[in-house]
C-alpha cells in the first residue's frame, strides 16, 4: 500500500483504506476500484491524499494506531457532543470517557508506538477528524511521558474536546477557509474560553480537561492566548494537546494556509523547542511521529524515487526506502532497498506528491 495524491490517481487504481464522512460513515470502501467519477468526487470533497494497493507495494502494511471501529466511534462522539452543545443540551461526558478509553486501550496495547499514518480528510469531516487525530497524538505523547491511567483519561478527553468551544462561534467563521480578518481572529480566540465553560460544568469530567480546552493555545514564551500564560503557569497536559494541535494544523489545510509535508512540519516543531513548547515535549514528539510516513513517495539525493516501506524508530528521519523509479524514470521491480540508517551517504531530498 502507498500514498497517492488525488491529482495523480488513475482509473483502475484500487483504494487501500476506507474513506469516512464526518459522522464515521463509509464514503468509499477499501478495495474499491476507482473510476473517473469516483476520482472527480474525491477532488470535489477536498481529499488530497489517499492510499492505494498495487503489486509493487502490496506487502507494505500501514497500521493505524487505533482500530477503524474506534476511530469511527470517536468521530461520532465529537459530532454528537458538538451537536448537543449547539442546541443547548448537555454533552454526554460518560460517552466521551468511554470513547477515549477505547483509544487509550489501543495506544497502551502497542508496546512500541509510532504515528506513521496520514489522514484522508474531506471538507465535511476535517473538523472532527482533526479532533480525533489530536486526541490520538496527545495520548501517544502522554503514554511516552509516563502519565498514569486517570491522567491519560483527562488528557484524552481534553484533547478530543479541545475545540468544543467553536460551536459557540458563527458557523461561517468555523467553516471559513480563507485567512481570518483581525476581528474574526479575535472572535475565534474566544473558543478556548467557551470550551472551558462548557467542560468545567460537567461533574463526570476531570476539571483538567476543561483547562486543556482553555490553555491549548498558550505558549511557553507567553505569546499565546487567551491569557498569555508562560513557563510554569502552563499545565503540561495543555502543552501536550497544544503541540498535537499545532502539528496537525501544519500537515492539514486550514484558514489561509495550505498543508505542508510531515518532515517540514517536524522541522518547524523542532524550532519551537523552549519557545512554544518545552524541550522535553518536543524531543518526545519527534521520537514518536514519522517525518516520512510509511507509504509516501520520496526522492533521494541519488536521483532515485522510492516508497517508504518501514521506519527506523530510533532515527525517524532515516527510514527504509524501496526504489521504484530510477533517475531516468525507468520502472524497477523491487530493484533494491535503502536502509538510510546504514546507507549514510544516501538521504531524502523531498516528498513526491
Labelled PLM ranges:
Residues 32, 75-353:
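Histidine- and acidic-residue-rich, metal-dependent catalytic cores
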Residues 1-97, 326-329, 334, 338-353:
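Membrane-cytosol interface segments
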Amino acid at each position: 500500500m502507498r500514498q497517492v495524491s488525488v491529482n495523480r490517481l488513475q482509473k483502475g487504481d484500487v483504494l487501500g483504506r476506507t474513506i469516512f464522512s464526518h459522522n464515521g460513515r463509509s464514503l468509499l470502501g477499501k478495495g474499491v476500484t476507482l473510476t473517473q467519477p469516483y476520482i472527480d468526487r474525491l477532488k470535489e470533497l477536498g481529499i488530497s491524499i489517499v492510499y492505494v494497493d498495487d503489486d509493487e507495494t502490496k506487502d507494505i502494511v500501514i497500521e493505524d494506531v487505533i482500530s477503524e471501529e474506534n476511530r469511527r466511534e470517536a468521530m461520532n462522539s465529537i459530532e454528537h457532543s458538538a451537536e448537543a452543545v449547539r442546541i443547548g443540551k448537555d454533552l454526554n461526558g460518560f460517552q466521551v470517557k468511554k470513547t477515549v478509553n477505547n483509544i487509550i486501550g489501543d495506544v497502551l496495547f502497542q508496546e512500541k508506538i509510532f504515528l506513521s499514518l496520514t489522514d484522508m480528510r474531506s471538507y465535511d469531516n476535517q473538523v472532527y477528524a482533526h479532533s480525533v487525530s489530536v486526541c490520538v497524538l496527545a495520548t501517544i505523547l502522554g503514554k511516552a511521558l509516563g502519565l498514569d491511567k486517570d491522567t491519560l483519561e483527562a488528557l484524552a478527553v481534553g484533547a478530543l474536546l479541545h475545540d468544543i468551544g467553536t460551536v459557540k462561534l458563527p458557523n461561517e467563521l468555523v467553516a471559513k477557509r480563507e485567512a481570518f480578518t483581525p476581528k474574526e481572529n479575535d472572535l475565534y480566540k474566544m473558543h478556548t474560553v467557551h470550551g472551558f465553560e462548557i467542560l468545567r460544568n460537567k461533574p463526570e469530567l476531570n476539571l483538567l480537561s476543561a483547562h486543556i480546552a482553555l490553555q491549548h493555545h498558550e505558549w511557553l514564551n507567553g505569546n499565546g492566548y487567551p491569557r498569555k500564560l508562560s513557563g510554569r503557569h502552563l499545565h503540561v497536559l495543555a502543552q501536550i494537546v497544544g503541540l498535537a494541535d499545532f502539528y496537525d494544523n501544519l500537515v492539514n489545510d486550514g484558514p489561509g494556509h495550505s498543508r505542508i509535508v510531515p518532515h517540514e512540519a517536524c522541522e518547524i516543531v523542532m524550532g519551537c523547542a523552549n519557545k512554544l513548547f518545552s524541550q522535553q515535549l518536543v524531543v518526545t514528539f519527534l521520537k514518536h511521529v514519522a517525518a516520512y510516513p510509511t507509504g509516501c513517495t520520496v526522492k533521494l539525493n541519488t536521483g532515485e524515487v522510492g516508497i517508504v516501506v518501514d521506519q527506523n524508530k530510533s532515527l525517524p528521519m532515516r527510514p527504509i526506502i524501496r526504489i521504484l523509479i530510477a533517475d531516468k524514470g525507468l520502472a524497477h521491480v523491487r530493484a533494491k532497498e535503502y536502509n538510510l540508517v546504514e546507507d549514510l551517504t544516501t538521504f531524502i531530498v523531498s516528498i513526491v506528491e
